[in-house]
Amino acid sequence: MIEASKLTTEFGSLVFNDKIMKERLPKDIYKAVHKTIEKEPHLEPGCSYSCSSNHEGVGNREQCYHFTPPGSSPMTGLTAEKHDSFISPTEDGRSSWSSQEKSWLRANLMHQASQWWSSCHNSSMRGYQHGILHHHAFIKDGSLLLPTAFCSYGGEALDRDSLLRSMEALSNEAVKMMRLLGYEDVNRVNTTIGSEQEYFLIDKDFYKKRKDLLLTGRTLIGAPASKGQEMEDHYFGVIKPKVSAYMHDLDEELWKLGIPAKTKHNEVAPSQHELAPVFETANIAVDHNQLTMEVMKKVADKHNYACLLHEKPFEGVNGSGKHNNWSICTDTGINLLDPGKNPGENIPFLVFLMSVIAAVDEYAPILRLSVASAGNDHRLGGNEAPPAIISIFVGDELAEVLKAVEAGEAYKAAGKSQMTWEQQYFTFTKDNTDRNRTSPFAFTGNKFESDGGHSSVANGKYGPQHMQLQKEVATLNAKLSAYSGDELKEKVKEVLKETLLAHKRVLFNGNGYTDEWVEEAAKRGLPNLKALPDCMPYWISDESIDLFTRHGIFTKEEIYSRYEILLENYSKSIHIESLTMQEMIRKDLTEGLVAYEKDLSKEIVQKKSLLDGDCCALELGVLKSLDKSSAEMGKALSKLFEDTKKAEGMTEALETASYYESTVLADMDELRKYADEAEALIPEKYLSYPTYGEMLFSLR
């Protein structure tokens, strides 16, 4: 346990951070590193050697025998590592602690990049991991993890390269806008992200007995427990002692890695919890979230828990998401999404707000795709997560500001209201907007919050969002660049009004869960893309390809490869679920069902031989219900088997994914209905796997 007095010194103690670099690197090297981070694309060879030598020294001093890239996240969305030893043999048969400069900054050759690239490409393709300086090296499990980006042999981006490129492109255009508006001291604009990570904890022994959780991350069968989340007593409730101990250890491990974990609490569903960090620059936040999820699972294992990060591990209760708080900030400290005291006169705020509105409206299908997956599609559109229809909530105050913009009038602020209630001890003002949990993209004071994010993968898909915003800012720049002074002020008002009129259909402050909104959205022409296959044609549209290739974020080949990979991953996920479900029904559930029916039948026969009249009414009723469910289950199982076989023979990616979504998933839902009916009647002692009641309500 970290003592409170040592917390500040322990924070980042496993990181080769700026403080350490300043202490250990020669002054000229340290300055060169910072220059590279801020402006230059490459580090000089001599500087790279010095950095590598210092990394070697860190590894030696901290007894790290291996080094590896820090969990690069290739196209599967999963962590990838390749560990190499610092040890090198010498001519006299001994070994030396060797600097590995080429393995970090000059390129680390990886075998089989095609495993992450696409099965449609050359299977012998190799890949490289090249060093980057925007991230710090750190120590994990006895290895020194060195910051890299992963690319294929041909230079195609496979992980964070596209995010870094998009951030650079957005910054360039945003800086141009800020200087046009008179902010000459702005040299860089970054996006920031704070990701609220939801997760479930269950007993590890229960987890090991569930094939579906082990193989797919979610339960494929399971009758609901007698109690769910209807009492609303878990959200922000008192954290149970053993869970609190887990959270405490998790905080300490994250703090040592320099991850600013801040908030922890119980979530809505039983056994569901949340961890939230302080916001960071987008690329750092994405990497830290990837690392956080890995650490969460490892710490859970030490506490005899299993940490479930799937978006919908349990039917009938809320699933998990990643609530991403996203903003735009200058290097001079200006939050461009902060309305300030007078939002109607805050021109930078209005310009970037309008750019966001235009980007969300124009590229809604791509935003929907960024949160689409086989797991997350179970959650979106239900009364627990934002709908699949992309809209923006701006709150009451900003709605009035936008009305003034549209009318060409000055906005008159109503003033902040005071919070008052009986026995009030302090006076404070209300926020300028409430939170709307039914909106997929909600303004929350000085940022946008997106509740639709995946809980199981990091936020690496922010690259497209950055480019959508970059395109809209560039459009405004083109319209305004010829003006200055008072003419510029008037032209800004004109352009803002023009942009708002073109895109205001995407604004919606109401309840996104209602059928009325679905009807209204259709009238407005907003797309309702219910699953990943519905989104994919938009990804390879001419408009999308032009957006990403124009600034080198993706090549056309990279776009099409992602198209194939996303569809392939979607189909494979559902295919594995189908096979796992069939196995659990045939072996695990059927075994318990038959054993119980056999014992129940014997009991009925024995009682009828001893008793007169209408005895065994209860037992007969249960037996008949089991027999009926069993018969329907058999039919549904056969249909799922046949339809899965048909899907296995399909070759076209979109057609296959669409078939899995429309047919195989529907078969699984039908089969589950009868399986859950049967399970609800079978005593727990007959089942070889734990029930919902055991898993969700056993933590202490």
Curated annotation (Swiss-Prot):
- PROSITE patterns in the record: GLNA_ATP, GS_BETA_GRASP, GS_CATALYTIC
The catalytic activity, as recorded, is: L-glutamate + NH4(+) + ATP = L-glutamine + ADP + phosphate + H(+)
Gene Ontology cellular component list: cytoplasm
Keyword Ligase assigned to the entry: answer is yes
Q: What is its EC number?
A: 6.3.1.2
Q: Primary place of residence?
A: cytoplasm
Name the InterPro entries for this protein. Answer: Gln-synt_C, Gln_synt_N, Gln_synth/guanido_kin_cat_dom, Gln_synth_cat_dom, Gln_synth_gly_rich_site, GS_Type-3, GSIII_N
The cofactor note reads: Binds 2 Mg(2+) ions per subunit.
Binding of Mg(2+) 1, residues: 196, 323, 472
Q: Tell me the domain of life.
A: Bacteria
Residues that bind Mg(2+) 2: 198, 267, 274
Q: SUPFAM superfamilies attached here?
A: Glutamine synthetase/guanido kinase
GO MF annotation terms:
ATP binding; glutamine synthetase activity; metal ion binding
Q: How is the activity of this chain controlled?
A: The activity of this enzyme is not controlled by adenylation.
Question: SMART domains annotated for this entry?
Answer: Gln-synt_C
Task: Please report a single Pfam family linked to this protein.
Answer: Gln-synt_C
Name the keywords, alphabetized: ATP-binding, Cytoplasm, Ligase, Magnesium, Metal-binding, Nucleotide-binding
What residues bind ATP, as annotated? 327, 435
Stretches assigned to the GS catalytic domain: 159-589
- Which amino acids does the record list as binding L-glutamate? 318-319, 435
Which coenzymes or cofactors are required?
A: Mg(2+)
Location of the GS beta-grasp domain: 65-155
Q: How does it assemble?
A: Homohexamer.
Family as reported in the entry's similarity comment: Belongs to the glutamine synthetase family.
Briefly, what is this protein's role?
Catalyzes the ATP-dependent biosynthesis of glutamine from glutamate and ammonia.
Annotated protein name in UniProt: Glutamine synthetase
